[in-house]
């Protein structure tokens, strides 16, 4: 009898423990939550997510790299389970072996070491344009591969089994910095079979969104451009399906519904009316009212105007300097609300000599936050050009301010506001005079952000039409021998503190030549209904971690959310 009672009690305890591991009952899938993450994007290729903050916010939910940077700016393991260093100085042999965790793609296939290797080889393909290429140049033969001097098969990275990636380096490097850089969204794993098929069928991998296969906590399960985006829990994300792990063991929300039919202003009104519960982009007209309530963090990006130096109006450095000098960046930050006046290209969130050491604080102010119109007019006061922007309230407001200032000097400025797809085409083809870019620092290290202005590190490969097969400059067309030498010296220096000197000199020279005009350091600001949602976490890159987000009494909201989902799919 005592044994029977003990068995019953044990069974009851186990049942209680199992229930405590899940928020679901029976066949339930979980909460459907209406959110607004940011403005619509049209390219979901993580290797190209560096022209605006919204792309980072969305793709950060879909993909997971080997490491991550937490909200405190510290490197953490993500897909990477462990690593070990193998050194043989006598043979000049330096390697890192990275073991990845057991997880699956959103279609149920195991994430393999080969998926990481493929993604990196894709970035280093001479015919593929990607600014993140320089992050991989420490790998043996990487630069030669990107320049077309070596075969991709000569690249020093390989999958030695299903879970281990072996990286061979050109020399002894700062291994901690390499791991820090692996948090870059561009370096996440990709499936070769998926990318190849989509590029063949659709002409572009990143635009075949309705069937996108991802390894992060969420997966795209429905998309109607200009209308809605539906992100469902990736049911294979770290779950042990053989042992029947609870559906919500690693990702609690079942579905995130994003309304793109409404803009930031309309979504802000919907938030105020209780129709959505998380607002990741606050309407411009309401920002001042939310300044105290919003959670605000500094981003790894700078809103910048790129000057196409191949255009006659921008070939003269004095014109570029004049346009920069005339702007009151304090006023621009005031217009945007959630921003700081830019005093250089690199924002304060980027590290310098060590983790947590601010590059911007150490480098000081390279450009003034205040306007000097008289000084600007002494440099240049005439010219005509078109300013290309994305068609949204914030970029329009900034552009109208700049246009007013510049036309007051004597310039003629035309603003061209484009959809996301048309904007990307203009940016990638260089079909612009001046273009607004949320310039993303790909990592917490300043090297990658500065190196792209050296053609050898631009990620654009080589010009096969040129008899010298020269490296193709970055989209602004900037090419300065003195600047390029500073970047080469920084790349050759393995001591992070010593390398800092070259990088600061490079930024100073860039701001003297001004092929890019930094305006504001971007900030992220969001609000959510704390009576309904909890468990939202931040990341250093500015996207949210919704894995453990809970919706109070979510079953009461289920009918409304389900109706929204149904309407969106019709």
Spans of model-derived segments:
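N-terminal lobe/hinge region of extracytoplasmic solute-binding protein
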Residues: 36-88, 213
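Periplasmic-binding protein-like
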Residues: 45, 290, 310-353, 397-398, ...
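Aromatic- and charge-enriched surface segment that lines or borders ligand/interaction sites
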Residues: 82-135, 166, 313-315
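Surface-exposed binding/hinge segments that line
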Residues: 131-196, 224
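Gly/Pro-rich hinge or "lid" segments in bacterial periplasmic/extracellular proteins
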Residues: 172-173, 180-255, 265
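Structural transition elements
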Residues: 337-379, 391-395
